[in-house]
């Protein structure tokens, strides 16, 4: 699913809202999540998951074409940890324990 499809689905579920308003809301939510992560904050959507950033330290890497050793600089990367409800919905029955 891409962002425009998400906007269409949300707009269809909420016919009282204009398509443009739904698009603005989706963009605002994504902008707020992005701004929070850029500030180093964690964003938790209970039941769905949590977004955070993790530091990847600098290291020595290798160019796959030439085999030449290269220096890879330190960087921050986004990380997503799934929430319990999302995991359970993706894997129904996995958390159920049966007594025999």
UniProtKB/Swiss-Prot annotation:
Gene Ontology biological process terms from the UniProt entry: DNA recombination; regulation of DNA-templated transcription; regulation of translation
Query: By its UniProt entry, which InterPro entries does this protein fall under?
Result: Hist_DNA-bd, Histone-like_DNA-bd_CS, IHF-like_DNA-bd_dom_sf, IHF_beta
Q: Which Pfam families match?
A: Bac_DNA_binding (PF00216)
Q: Is Transcription regulation tagged as a keyword?
A: yes
Please provide, in alphabetical order, the Gene Ontology terms of the cellular component aspect for this entry. chromosome; cytosol
Q: Keywords of this protein's UniProt record, alphabetized?
A: DNA recombination, DNA-binding, Transcription, Transcription regulation, Translation regulation
Q: Does the keyword DNA-binding apply?
A: yes
Q: Which GO terms describe its molecular function?
A: DNA binding; structural constituent of chromatin
- Give the CDD domains listed for this entry: IHF_B
Q: What does this protein do?
A: This protein is one of the two subunits of integration host factor, a specific DNA-binding protein that functions in genetic recombination as well as in transcriptional and translational control.
Q: Which PANTHER family match?
A: DNA-BINDING PROTEIN HU (PTHR33175), INTEGRATION HOST FACTOR SUBUNIT BETA (PTHR33175:SF5)
Which family does this protein fall into? Belongs to the bacterial histone-like protein family.
Quaternary organization: Heterodimer of an alpha and a beta chain.
Q: What is this protein called?
A: Integration host factor subunit beta
């Amino acid at each position: 699913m891409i962002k425009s499809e998400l906007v269409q689905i949300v707009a269809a579920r909420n016919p009282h809202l204009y398509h443009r308003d739904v698009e603005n809301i989706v963009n605002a939510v994504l902008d707020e999540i992005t701004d929070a992560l850029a500030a180093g904050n964690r964003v938790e959507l209970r039941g769905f998951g949590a977004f955070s950033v993790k530091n990847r330290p600098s290291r020595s890497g290798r160019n796959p074409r030439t085999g030449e050793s290269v220096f890879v600089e330190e960087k921050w990367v986004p990380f997503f940890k799934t929430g319990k409800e999302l995991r359970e919905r993706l894997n129904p029955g996995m958390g159920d324990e049966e007594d025999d």
